Amino acid sequence: MAALRALCGFRGVAAQVLRPGAGVRLPIQPSRGVRQWQPDVEWAQQFGGAVMYPSKETAHWKPPPWNDVDPPKDTIVKNITLNFGPQHPAAHGVLRLVMELSGEMVRKCDPHIGLLHRGTEKLIEYKTYLQALPYFDRLDYVSMMCNEQAYSLAVEKLLNIRPPPRAQWIRVLFGEITRLLNHIMAVTTHALDLGAMTPFFWLFEEREKMFEFYERVSGARMHAAYIRPGGVHQDLPLGLMDDIYQFSKNFSLRLDELEELLTNNRIWRNRTIDIGVVTAEEALNYGFSGVMLRGSGIQWDLRKTQPYDVYDQVEFDVPVGSRGDCYDRYLCRVEEMRQSLRIIAQCLNKMPPGEIKVDDAKVSPPKRAEMKTSMESLIHHFKLYTEGYQVPPGATYTAIEAPKGEFGVYLVSDGSSRPYRCKIKAPGFAHLAGLDKMSKGHMLADVVAIIGTQDIVFGEVDR
């Protein structure tokens, strides 16, 4: 009303206002001492345009449904789709998970692999048997010599040769050093993913010492190419066995410190107990091996059930879990490190003298001293490293107990110097296939704990 008065140019004027389109007068309280204002016809006509009187043209016109609003529909609630990785620091490489979350609860976990695929199995078909060996270092690049050991045993089975005893003891010695390397990486990075940073720094100092043993024996810290078909590349340098003994004597103290930090830690137990539970039946159905199988209560270790090299001559125990959760698998790995120290001590005590390569000039390259005096040795050396040696036709599946599980090599020979087919069985591939089952129903943060306990390396998964 005040706006209407201001529009007419009057302030405080008592009047009766004619509502547009109707003959109803609205009384207005008159002010004292002011004459009453009456709106004229011209003023009232300016509001007449808003009223539409029915006519022939407008008889069939219907007003638009201004108030005919659709009723509200129920909102469709969908689960969140989350991409975990491949650049996530807890993905342990190039893992990509497409997860379906209900709040923070995992409903589905779909691993997408292949981001580190390099065509290793096909590349091996174009190399000689010796040239194919370095590819195995780059599969599981945390446990290098164990991969070499599996491939060398497969080639030796096709060639029907057996390396000398000293070479076999050296293989077992460095196989257990490699197991320590792998389990240090597995346990400490698992703890690092869950927020415990100290074990990572403590045990990586010990890991550095083992890399020095690698370097002294082969010249390389990681990709050693030391274990070869027919034996090992070269003998142990002087003083190395003494240094390994000193290391193994002190390493058990580092393991005690690790267990003081983690084993009875309330936070660590809450994050790992009853997380990622796998029953014994499920572990067998998924094809699990190694710690993933033993953590569920199945005592299966190829070093015991199908011993290779000289594992039948050493004494060690196989730790087994009971619940099949992340905590049991952690305890299994720590105890396996202690058993590896037992095996290392026996290797140092029982190391025999003798040759480190099979005495067959068609398979093993000659010594440098012989090459300088014998023309035949020089020819053998040249032929071995250019054309390679012919392997009799046949096929073999050879498996070893790698730190992550059963690492198998299916090797097919057609009688030439190059493999016809080399199929690699990686333990991490089967473990990753069970990630959906293990993580379903857990929180998003528990998926990190489950990935850590699986100990996955994508060099061997993607190949």
Swiss-Prot record:
Q: What sort of enzyme, by top EC class, is this?
A: translocase
Q: What, per the annotation, is the impact of changing residue 446 to N? A: In MC1DN6; loss of catalytic activity; no change in Km value for ubiquinone-1
- Where does it sit, as one GO cellular component term? mitochondrial inner membrane
* Residues annotated as binding [4Fe-4S] cluster: 326, 332, 347
Biological process (GO) annotations?
aerobic respiration; cellular response to oxygen levels; gliogenesis; mitochondrial ATP synthesis coupled electron transport; mitochondrial electron transport, NADH to ubiquinone; mitochondrial respiratory chain complex I assembly; neural precursor cell proliferation; neurogenesis
- How does the UniProt record describe the way this protein sits in the membrane? Peripheral membrane protein
N6-acetyllysine: modified positions: 62
- Which ranges of the sequence are coiled-coil? none
Q: What is its main location?
A: mitochondrion
Tell me the residues on which Symmetric dimethylarginine occurs. Answer: 118
> Pfam families, alphabetically?
Complex1_49kDa (PF00346)
Q: How is the cofactor bound?
A: Binds 1 [4Fe-4S] cluster.
Has UniProt tagged this entry with the keyword Transport?
yes
- Write down the InterPro entries for this protein, in alphabetical order: NADH_Q_OxRdtase_suD, NADH_UbQ_OxRdtase_49kDa_CS, NDH1_su_D/H, NiFe-Hase_large
Q: Transit peptide, first to last residue?
A: 1-33
What modifications does the entry list under PTM / processing? Dimethylation at Arg-118 by NDUFAF7 takes place after NDUFS2 assembles into the complex I, leading to stabilize the early intermediate complex.
E.C. designation(s)? 7.1.1.2
Compartments annotated for it: namely: Mitochondrion inner membrane
Is this entry keyworded Acetylation?
yes
Cofactors, names only: [4Fe-4S] cluster
Q: Which UniProt keywords apply?
A: 4Fe-4S, Acetylation, Disease variant, Electron transport, Iron, Iron-sulfur, Leber hereditary optic neuropathy, Membrane, Metal-binding, Methylation, Mitochondrion, Mitochondrion inner membrane, NAD, Oxidoreductase, Primary mitochondrial disease, Respiratory chain, Transit peptide, Translocase, Transport, Ubiquinone
Q: Which disease is it linked to?
A: Mitochondrial complex I deficiency, nuclear type 6: A form of mitochondrial complex I deficiency, the most common biochemical signature of mitochondrial disorders, a group of highly heterogeneous conditions characterized by defective oxidative phosphorylation, which collectively affects 1 in 5-10000 live births. Clinical disorders have variable severity, ranging from lethal neonatal disease to adult-onset neurodegenerative disorders. Leber-like hereditary optic neuropathy, autosomal recessive 2: An autosomal recessive form of Leber hereditary optic neuropathy, a mitochondrial disease resulting in bilateral painless loss of central vision due to selective degeneration of the retinal ganglion cells and their axons. LHONAR2 is characterized by subacute bilateral or asymmetrical visual loss, optic nerve pseudoedema and peripapillary telangiectasia in the early phase of the disease, and eventual partial recovery in some patients.
The similarity comment for this entry is:
Belongs to the complex I 49 kDa subunit family.
The subunit field of the Swiss-Prot or TrEMBL record says: Core subunit of respiratory chain NADH dehydrogenase (Complex I) which is composed of 45 different subunits. Component of the iron-sulfur (IP) fragment of the enzyme. Interacts with NDUFAF3. Interacts with NDUFAF7. Interacts with CERS2.
This chain belongs to which protein, by name? Answer: NADH dehydrogenase [ubiquinone] iron-sulfur protein 2, mitochondrial
Question: What is the species of this protein?
Answer: Homo sapiens
Q: What is the lineage of its organism?
A: Eukaryota, Metazoa, Chordata, Craniata, Vertebrata
